[in-house]
């Protein structure tokens, strides 16, 4: 029977075992090597506000961290950046303090300021002042950024005041007036619109068909919408009536014969006329040349005055009667048209007759003045 030969695994040389172990270790990344221990987390909670030593030996630098291969946390990175900022800040402060010290030494060497060294601040005070200045500059910049828009945005009042001061005030012409019935406050960015208050009266300059009119309010020219205003009717200025004004300035019609004779300066003939039947003005209107012959009034000036006064009285009375008839005839067609609208009756306003009566009054007053002038010229 065949027998199996015993294996010679145990008889292998130690050198071969060492080779195998080296191969395994190299292929499996050296598991036998001890693993790096994880950093121990302290039970006390880390706080950035705590005082951290600023010595180079106590604080790990970025180079040491890269050599060790340890991963730093966010807290450590913050600590490192803080320390680096402090170091750079100190260097800048030292450089500034040295420059300031040099300038102060130059100032102390001058004879004009012998006591400058006593009042000059030291480098430590300068460093504190510099740090405080940096802290103040940050909020100042933020304030400037926040208020930048306010400064840049133009206020509505400033632009309007500038325009009002430079632009001359509009004086006319105007095409009407309008009263505001609804308050309206325009946008602060709209410089052309007018601020309207109820009861304001606007002088209208232009009425375009678009609906936004142009007007003058409180000395300021601007636009406004017609829906906020009511157009005021234009004041109808009637034509002047010179006849009434002239009649007011002149004397009224005499009421008695004696008053008429006093005006023309012939009071001496009053008794003669009264005794011969001329008691009133109605009787005096019928005076003729034949009557003067019967009354034995032969003075040509007196005869002319008396005849002219009688004619003017007659014309004045006939004119007034015709004016009254004209007014009555103007009223009668209106009544008839109401009763029977089909009847066609010519209308008469009586304006023409009224003008003749006023003209007669003026002529009567003019003749009286002429008679008075003749009497004065004929007097010795």
From Swiss-Prot:
This is SAM and SH3 domain-containing protein 3. The keyword Isomerase does not apply. May function as a signaling adapter protein in lymphocytes. The modification Phosphoserine is found at residues 27, 34, 42, 97, 110, 113, 120, 320. SUPFAM superfamilies: SAM/Pointed domain, SH3-domain. It comes from Bos taurus. Residues 318-327 have a biased composition (Acidic residues). Residues 143-158 have a biased composition (Polar residues). GO terms for cellular component: cytoplasm; nucleus. Pfam families: SAM_1, SH3_2, SPIDER. The modification Phosphothreonine is found at residues 61, 103, 112, 318. Coiled coil: none annotated. CDD domains: SH3_SASH3. Residues 173-234 form the SH3 domain. Belongs to the SASH family. InterPro entries: SAM, SAM-SH3_domain_protein, SAM/pointed_sf, SASH3_SH3, SH3-like_dom_sf, SH3_domain, SPIDER. Residues 84-93 have a biased composition (Basic residues). Residues 252-316 form the SAM domain. GO terms for biological process: B cell homeostasis; B cell proliferation; CD4-positive, alpha-beta T cell differentiation; homeostasis of number of cells within a tissue; positive regulation of adaptive immune response; positive regulation of B cell proliferation; positive regulation of CD4-positive, alpha-beta T cell differentiation; positive regulation of immunoglobulin production.
